[in-house]
Amino acid sequence: MSESVRTNTSIWSKGMLSVIVAQFLSAFGDNALLFATLALLKAQFYPDWSQPVLQMVFVGAYILFAPFVGQIADSFAKGRVMMVANGLKLAGAAGICLGVNPFVGYTLVGIGAAAYSPAKYGILGELTTGDKLVKANGLMEASTIAAILLGSVAGGVLADWHVIAALVACALAYAGAVAANLFIPKLVAARPGQSWRLSAMTRSCFSACVVLWSNGETRFSLVGTGLFWGAGVTLRFLLVLWVPVALGITDNATPTYLNAMVAVGIVVGAGAAAKLVTLETVSRCMPAGILIGVVVAIFSLQHALLPAYALLLLIGMLGGFFVVPLNALLQERGKKSVGAGNAIAVQNLGENSAMLLMLGLYSLAVLVGVPAVAIGIGFGVLFALAIAALWIWQRRQASY
C-alpha cells in the first residue's frame, strides 16, 4: 500500500485526503478546546491573568519539545506519529472532562500538538512532490483555517450551553482525528536509526537549525513564517483591546466575528497561492506580506464595523497568499537537507518564539499605557518594514 502511495502523488489520493480530514478534526478540537477551557476557568473562578497563561503553556510545549519532535517525525511513519499525537490530545481533553487540572490537561494537549505539527507538514512532501506540494499546502492551510473558524465558534456556543458538553465535543473531535489517521498508509520512515540520547537529539536539533539558517532560501522561509504567525497571534489579542475603543462595542462576540473574517480571508488567499505561486516564483508572495502591515495600520483607524470586516477579510487573504508558498519552500528544501520533520520542528521553534516575543512586546505596550489605536498603527508599520527588509535581503542573496 505504501508503494502505491509513493506512485500516486495526486493531491486527491486516499492518503492525502486522510491527512486533510485528520488535520481538520485535530485543529477543530484545538480551537474548540481553547474556548471551552477558558469558559471552564471562568466557571471555576480562576483569575483573569490565568487565561493568557493557558496559551503560554501550549506555546511553551512547542518550544520545549522542539529538539525532539522533528526526529520523532522522521524516525517513524509520519501517519502513525500523527495518530499518537492526536491520542495525547484526546487524553488531555478527556482528562479536563474528568476533573484534571485544566492547565495540566491543556499542557498535555500542547505536547501532542508539538509532536503532531512536524509530522502533518512533513508527510505532505512524502505524499506528493513539486508544484503539487504548494497545492497540498493550500489544502492543508484551508482545512486548518476552516477548522479554526468552526472550532472557535462551536467551542464558544457549546460552552455557553454547557461547559462539559463542549469539552466532550472536543474529545470526540480528537477521537475522530485518531480514526482518520488509521487510513493514512504506513510510509517508510525518512531517517530511521538515529540516536535517542537527549544530548544527541538536542545536538541534532541545533545542527538542523544551523543547516537551515545557513541556507538563504530556508532562512528566508523561517523568518517570513515566524513574522507572520507571531503577528497573527498578536492581532488576535489586539482585536479584543481595539474593539471597545474604536467601535464602542463591549460584547465578547464582536472580536470573535472579526477574527473569523481573517480566517475566511486566509482560506481564499491560500487557494490563490496554490494556483498562482510555484517553488520557483516564491518571491511573488512578498508584496502581499508588506501589504498586510499597511492594511493593519489602515484598519486601526476605522470607527465603523463594516469597513473593519472588509479590511480584516483582506488581511486574511494577503496572509494566506503570503504564508503558503513559504511553508512549501521550507518543506521542499528542508526535506533534502535535514529531513522534513526536523525542518518543520525548527520552523515551529522559530514561529512560537516569535509569538512569545511579539506578545511580550504587545503586553509591554499595553502595560505602559499606549492606546490601542496607536499600538495597531505601530504594529502594522513595523510589520510592513520587517517584510520589506526581508524581501530586499532575499533579492540580494539571490543575486550572489
UniProtKB/Swiss-Prot annotation:
Signal peptide: none
Transmembrane feature ranges: 19-39, 53-73, 91-111, 139-159, 164-184, 227-247, 257-277, 281-301, 304-324, 352-372, 373-393
GO cellular component: plasma membrane
GO molecular function, one term: lysophospholipid:sodium symporter activity
Alphabetical list of Gene3D superfamilies matching this protein: MFS general substrate transporter like domains (1.20.1250.20)
InterPro entries according to UniProt: LysoPLipid__transptr_LplT, MFS, MFS_trans_sf
Pfam families assigned to the protein according to its UniProt record, in alphabetical order: MFS_1
Keywords from the UniProt entry: Cell inner membrane, Cell membrane, Lipid transport, Membrane, Transmembrane, Transmembrane helix, Transport
Membrane topology: Multi-pass membrane protein
Localisation: Cell inner membrane
Entry coiled-coil feature ranges: none
Annotated function: Catalyzes the facilitated diffusion of 2-acyl-glycero-3-phosphoethanolamine (2-acyl-GPE) into the cell.
NCBIfam families with a match to the protein in the record: PRK11195.1
Family: Belongs to the major facilitator superfamily. LplT (TC 2.A.1.42) family.
PANTHER family assigned to the protein according to its UniProt record, in alphabetical order: MACROLIDE-EFFLUX PROTEIN (PTHR43266), MAJOR FACILITATOR SUPERFAMILY (MFS) PROFILE DOMAIN-CONTAINING PROTEIN (PTHR43266:SF2)
Name the UniProt record assigns to this protein: Lysophospholipid transporter LplT
Gene from which the chain derives: lplT
